[in-house]
Amino acid sequence: GSHDWRDLMAVKERIHLLQDTDDDGKADVAKVFAEGFNQEVNGVMAGVLPYRGDVFATIYPDVWKLNDTDQDGYADKQEVFIHGFGVHAAFDGHDLHGLTIGPDGKLYFSVGDNGFSVRTREGKLLHHPNTGGVLRCNWDGSNLEVFATGLRNVQELAFDEFGNLFSVDNDGDIREERERFVYITEGSDSGWRLNWQFKKGGWPRQTQTPEYCPWIDEKLWLPHWKGQAAYITPPMSEFSVGPGGFKYNPGTALNGRYKNSFFLCEFPVQKVTAFKTEPQGAYFKMVDEHIFLFGMMASAINFSPDGSLYVANWDGKWQPNELGSIWVVDDPAIRRSEKRKQVAELLRSNFARHADAFLIQLLANEDQRIRLEAQFELARRDKFEELLKVASNPNAKQLARVHALWGLGQLEDNSQRDKRLARRLPFTDSDFEIR
């Protein structure tokens, strides 16, 4: 694009559909599910999420919704789901990504510091042109809202089993600081603004402005310290080089060693790091950090229904090529265990066909993905009394109670029910995750 703006349209974005039809661990069917998205204003396709027959994709300046209506493996219906991201022409890749399912049943995604100015379907303007953040909405695009701001460019989002949202944010490309492990709470501001980047290095000479950068000079980027600005939510720790794919073990993946573990791709240094968190006051601290995988430029990761870890290898570094590959990482000792088979079978099943009683049982399942789908289906059926019974039962499994509470939160407002909730919700429960 430096010589001819039409160069920006030369490379198409693609979504590939890969299938292992004979269960030998290798993809034997490959189709281009969708391609194009190569107008001069388009960014990279940095996020893809298939869910309940729809495929959502983040392609700056839009979030797209794709459908294969005739089941032939190709997206024959494509529509702009949300528009208005990328106010600035900032760094490539600082746009849209991180599509994931929240514990409240909403669609979450992250926005880089190219910023956004989005008009919601209800007519409200969400205007944050100089920073990144996290947004969420219903699956029909309604009730789009800003969940958090002040982030530079978190690539992917991961919820732990208690609904705490974490990510790893990119640094500001300023010599004095580095990437950060962040705890993202609703309404939080992590402090970053796009213009901070142009307050250090050679930029002040170019812009003829004083070299003063609040991000560095006011130590906004550092983990909590005495005297830190009170309006920001600081990072938990300095961490990583070039964060990319980020996922949390759903509970039955890999083996017991990696239960409750996060996995982060650090593609410039060719490694995937694993770690866990422990509560520390109102915050968390990182523990058990170590290299999980080394030697490939891993850009994205995800857990399959059978519990193995898929790793996308971005071979060739920054230049477009056809050397990329997808690898499978697993523990061969338990890869085909009965538990793994049961989880995969349940995830393939139609939760709308399961009985209420069975869904209640699944709220205590070891796998986070199954618990969430059971919760969502009970909420869809408006099973108020059943969910309240589990939530208020001190003898029920902890995670079943957590999901029952989330399910209650998904139900429509009802003043009569609110009175019953006020009497029966476990506000004084001995478990702080419940009360």
Q: What residue spans do the PLM features occupy?
A:
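Structural helix-adjacent loops and short alpha-helical linkers that scaffold large soluble proteins
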Residues: 68, 415-417
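Alpha-solenoid HEAT/Armadillo-like helical repeat scaffolds in large eukaryotic proteins
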Residues: 361-362, 388-395, 421-430
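Structural detector for internal amphipathic alpha-helices that build alpha-solenoid repeat scaffolds
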Residues: 341-351, 368-381, 399-414, 421-427, ...
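Residue-level signal for short amphipathic helical patches enriched in basic/charged
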Residues: 58, 102, 160, 304, ...
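Periplasmic c-type cytochrome electron-transfer domains
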Residues: 360-372, 376-377, 381-384, 388-392
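Core helices of alpha-solenoid repeat scaffolds
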Residues: 356, 384, 418-419
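Beta-propeller domains with acidic blade repeats across secreted/periplasmic ectodomains
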Residues: 1-358, 373, 377
